[in-house]
Structure formats: C-alpha cells, structure tokens
Amino acid sequence: MKHIRNFSIIAHIDHGKSTLSDRLIQICGGLTEREMAAQVLDSMDLERERGITIKAQSVTLDYHAKDGETYQLNFIDTPGHVDFSYEVSRSLAACEGALLVVDAGQGVEAQTLANCYTAMEMDLEVVPVLNKIDLPAADPDRVSQEIEDIVGIDATDAVRCSAKTGVGVPDVLERLVRDIPPPEGDPEGPLQALIIDSWFDNYLGVVSLVRIKNGTMRKGEKIKVMSTGQIYNADRLGIFTPKREDTDVLNCGEVGWLVCAIKDILGAPVGDTLTLARHPAEKALPGFKKVKPQVYAGLFPISSDDYEAFRDALGKLSLNDASLFYEPESSTALGFGFRCGFLGLLHMEIIQERLEREYDLELITTAPTVVYEVQTTDGETVYVDSPGKLPPLNNIEELREPIAECHMLLPQEYLGNVITLCIEKRGVQTNMVYHGNQVALTYDIPMAEVVLDFFDRLKSTSRGYASLDYNFKRFTASDMVRVDVLINSERVDALALITHRDNSQYRGRELVEKMKDLIPRQQFDIAIQAAIGNHIIARSTVKQLRKNVLAKCYGGDVSRKKKLLQKQKDGKKRMKQVGNVELPQEAFLAILHVGKDSK
C-alpha cells in the first residue's frame, strides 16, 4: 500500500489539466504511441468539440521512480468549470492529494481558488504546478508569489513544467511520489468501497468507479450495497489504463471499476458504500453532500411519442451525472415533459446536447428560472421553480429571490467596467482586495441575473481576463413579478417569466416584439400581449394576410365595395373565434434571449 498514490488534477478552465494528464499517461506508458491522442481522457465528443472536461475520468498507471521503486498512481482528471464543481469534490473524496495546476501566464483565477479550498477542506496535500512555462507571456516568479498571496500555500518550490512540450513533467511525477501521502486503510478489515461515479453501459448494465477504503474486493464475491441492502455478484472488476482492463482483485487503497449486473439504474447510487455480503462493514462511509440545482428549465420532446424514450434517457444520464434533478411536468402548450434542475447554464446546455446526441431526441427547452421562496398570506413558505407554480399575486405576502455570492478575480484595468456590470445586475459589493495587479472582488448578485448571462458579459467586459466563482448565499425579499404572455387573449404557460418589477415593462415589451417577428402570419390578426396579473403592459399585433376582394370591381357603386369588404370582415371575425395559433420552436427560445441584445 505504501506504493500507491491517489491524486486529482485541479485547475481553472484552460490551464492545461487534460494536456498534463496526457503527458503523465505517455511517460508511464499507459498507452502506446499509436493509441495516444490529444486530450485522451476527454472521451465524449462534446468534450472534444468544446475543448472542456465535463466528466471526471480516472487512470491507473505504473511509474518507475528514480529511487528504484515502482509506484501505482491512480489519478483523476477533473473539470474546471464552476458548473461541474460537484464532479471535482467527488473526485477529491477519493484522493489523498491534488495537483493544483496554474497557468504561468494567466496566474491564479477564481476557479483555481475554489477548487483548492475544496481540497484543503478535505485535508488533502496540495502540490502546486506551474504549467505553460514555454509561453512567451509566462512569468513563473510572479505567479508563484500570487499563489502564496491569494491561495495561501507555499509555492516557492512549485514544479515548473510545460505539459505541451513535456518539459518538467518527470519532476511533477517525482514530486507527487515524494509529497502525496500513501492511502490509509486496513487491508485485513471488512470491505468498504466508496462509489465515486457510475455510468450505464448497454451491454454490462451499471458500471461503477470505486475507491477501496478498507479491505479487498475479489472477482466473484457477493457484494452488498449498504443503503439499499441489495446483494449483487461482482462479475468483473478492473482498472483503467485509460483502456478498461480486467483484474481479479482490487486491493485496499486502489481505484478501479466494477460490474455486478445491476440493471436498475438506482441500484448503486453515487456516494454509496459497498461491502461484502458474508462479512459486512458496520457502518457506511460518509458520502457526498447533495448538491442543490440552481437553475430549472422545462424540457419537452417535440413529438409526444418520444416521451418514454426521453424518460429512459434522463434516467441513464442522471446515473452518470448525480447533480441532475428531474420530475414530470405537463404544459398546455407543449404537452408532457420534465422539469429539470441544473447547476448552471453550461450544465443545462451540455445535458440538452447529450440527450439530443447520445439518445437521438429532439427537445424544446423553456426559459431557465431559479428557485424562489414565497411566503403566502396563509403563513406558508413554498419554493417555486417555475413561473407556472407561482401563486396568484393577491396570495403572496412576500417573494424572496436567491442571492449568489460571487467571487471575481480580475486585472485592475478592468475594474471600472466590471463594477458597472455588477451594479446593472443589481449587485451589492461586500469586499474588494488588491493583490499586486489583481483585484479580488466579492459581490452579492441575484442568482437569476448570474445564471442568465452574467458570465458571458463578465468575460466580454474584461476581454476574457476576469474569472468567476459563485455559490448560493441566502434568500432576500425582492419585488419580483410574473410576466405572462397572452396570444389572442389566451395565456401560454410555457412563455411566462419571473422578473424584477423595475425591468418588467422593458422585458415584456421586448418579448412581445420578438414574438411578433417569430409567429407566422395567419388569415386573421394575432394579438400578442404581455401582462402582470390582469394589467397589460405591452402589446403588438401580427397583421393578417388578406386577399384584395375589390380587385374584380371596375368602377360601380361604392355600396357594392362596402358589401364585399363587410363580408370579408365577417369571415375573418369567425375565423378568429375558431382559429388557433401554432407556435414555432423559435418562439420559446426567444425568451432565452430577452434582455441580452440591447444592453
């Protein structure tokens, strides 16, 4: 056991985690030169296209160190985006140490800080690594000073390397073996294995990634899931070298995969403990804290025949992504679908894309909303995650919206722009600290504003230099109203949105104007209105298509023309009473862009 090292690689987006993993795999000979590809651990097509890591991946490598010993390295490559921070904390729970990778040109960013604090809270050994020293802009001395000032860990002897060219990577491995402690645990004790992650394989059923904390796991043994008491047979187990390799035994301290013919998706939830059926452990390992979704949106299949397939797909996906929440929902405009909870907008986009790609579904998304806390006049407190569930205005005593605490790190020259943006987003400054040329800003900003487009606009006002990390802080009373959209005097539930009263006129008007361009013209006038309660705040009309009924009249009496026009008018009136309006998919997407273009 003293030759095992478990560690994660944590870093801000684009600081070179996945490239460093590639180098480690190459040096330790995990894959042959022919099998090597760039970002070999980003196995999903989506990850490669966007150049980001979404799922944490684990690899077991053998490293022949300079002291003549052979060490087994189990490492987990983690995502850098704030939306996937849950993946990071799960990966860290399986490790004794972490490599904190910092870009030697850009320096410390908000996500570096957040992930590093997560690692420190779990008492992990953090080894700082300065990456990209081959860049002309690299300034390792300034950055190591920054790590000490902002993060507060000793970085005087931080390893300097370039994952792209391979310079200094062997030093990273040596430092790992030296500084990160071996796993603790009792190889002779009863088996306790933590499920770090699981996914669904069409041939094998549920595949789980486990970290053996105590005892050993052998092929063919009866395994018991502690939370449900179910007993399964360990059919196959093994390690990733990134390829899946079978082994007969997983020893104490190792990280490996396990297949035990679980067909039920909820059979072995992530964060659960596995033990032996004949000699069970007394208590389960502490799992992971449940994450609360921050953003909710309705997802509906375009054709109602896909509902069953959509439900199965969500089940399989939620096995692989424990932070996804979903419950059935029906809408008069869109039929049956699911209300899903996500950690952020990027998470939502990724899930929608994965559903459409991996499971061949066509989906409509409604506008994302956050959770509001509502105090009703009866003294009850209810939590509302969609505009449709909001009680009528006269039943609401107080409406509270979630406030996010946002930590931003940015160069001084962009400070003015960023503060202006925060004020526009109704933010309140709580802290500001200067570290050399960097400024650390803390603002309390309503979650609804953060999830909408705050991140994109923060990046554009600071030319990409500012970085953001946010977490939920509290609920605060606020003057929020629901804006309904009426089409021909009928409310369309899927188009409603909750917004602040100050912005409601403007939002309503903008939404109505956008819808006007998107709804195809019919044989009769279509009135599009935005309303708060019974009060109409904006209206526009999609003009009817009409035939020129006077074309056949050459001269003649005016009463003849009047008669024809009146006849047409009556016909249109009748049509309007029975006609219904088909809304195109773009109309639902219009709400997503309300408030983005003009500011």
Swiss-Prot record:
It is an enzyme of class 3 (hydrolase). It is found in: Cell inner membrane. It comes from the Bacteria. One of its GO terms (molecular function) is ribosome binding. NCBIfam families: lepA (TIGR01393), small_GTP (TIGR00231). Belongs to the TRAFAC class translation factor GTPase superfamily. Classic translation factor GTPase family. LepA subfamily. This is Elongation factor 4. It comes from Erwinia tasmaniensis (strain DSM 17950 / CFBP 7177 / CIP 109463 / NCPPB 4357 / Et1/99).
